[in-house]
Amino acid sequence: MHVPDGFLDARTLISTAGLAAMGLGLALREVRRHLPARRVPLIGLAAAFIFAAQMLNFPVAAGTSGHLIGAALAAVLLGPAAAIVAMTAVLLLQALMFADGGITALGANVLNLAVIAPLVAHAVYSAVRRLAGESLQGTLLATGFAAWCSAMAAALACAAQLAASGVVAWGTVLAAMGGVHMVIGLGEAVITMLIVAVVARARPELVAPATTATAPPRHRAAVAYGATLSIGLMILVAPFASSLPDGLAHVAERFGFAESAVAAQPALLPDYTVVPLVAASPWLATVAAGAIGALVAFAVAWFVARALATPGRTTVRH
């Protein structure tokens, strides 16, 4: 659902960039106020894992694919402010290194995927968890519904931006984007629930209540588990991800505005590959690009969080 350059008009680009900057600024302030320094590696790990997971497109109906957004996963495990920071790091990296999402459309993508999606996920998760209870079943129910709602919210926000830009009629694009992402959102929900279920059993302190939670101990083990899973995804799964168009690309092809997409700058690692390695091994080219991206995502998110974190704080507000 990454909006490329060329889809949105100047007014929409400017307004979404302003809203995204406002949301990110508030999130950075919250992180500065409430993030314990010992949780910094988890933000880097979340960014790296979400980057790796977003490389894995899964097929859905009507020749379309989807991939994990990861906003709900980050919101559940990190809280909304830290989730916004981690998601923004991923989107910035994807735009600059992989041309996945336009440079001029970065504000729109950050607003949709890094601000709206985590905030909706957190609100839904908190509300459902209060109703369903803090048992594992209640947590997973809240997680799944929050993940589905976050995907729908991001899709409808994107649809509104396309309509506001005059690309396609409001009713047409809202129905098309909403319809396809209702299905993609189910995949988002299932994948997020599975990951949270594993985390809740292995590291239950990471699935914190929606208010205040004690900072988890032994972060080295959590980071090691997450890093191993991220590497496994890139090595074993990423090269076999679906090549079908994602929801936005499918809608663009269906309604004839796919040709409007332009690249504001060439990608350093086009199509998530290290080009010199493609001839020797396409699999290795994809794995190498994924590894580079995951490391950079970890480094960017870790650096920002480390600069903002509060030394000595032992609790984190979700």
Residue ranges, per PLM feature:
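Membrane-water interface at loop-to-transmembrane-helix junctions
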Residues: 141-145, 176-179, 212-229
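Alpha-helical membrane segments and adjacent membrane-interface helices in multi-pass membrane proteins
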Residues: 58-117
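Hydrophobic transmembrane alpha-helices
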Residues: 2-9, 14-73
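Short helix-perturbing small/polar motifs within transmembrane alpha-helices
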Residues: 112-154, 158
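Individual transmembrane alpha-helix segments
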Residues: 1, 270-303
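Interfacial loop-to-helix junctions that mark the boundaries of transmembrane helices
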Residues: 1-13, 36, 60-65, 105-108, ...
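Juxtamembrane non-transmembrane "cap" segments at the membrane-aqueous interface
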Residues: 156, 243-274
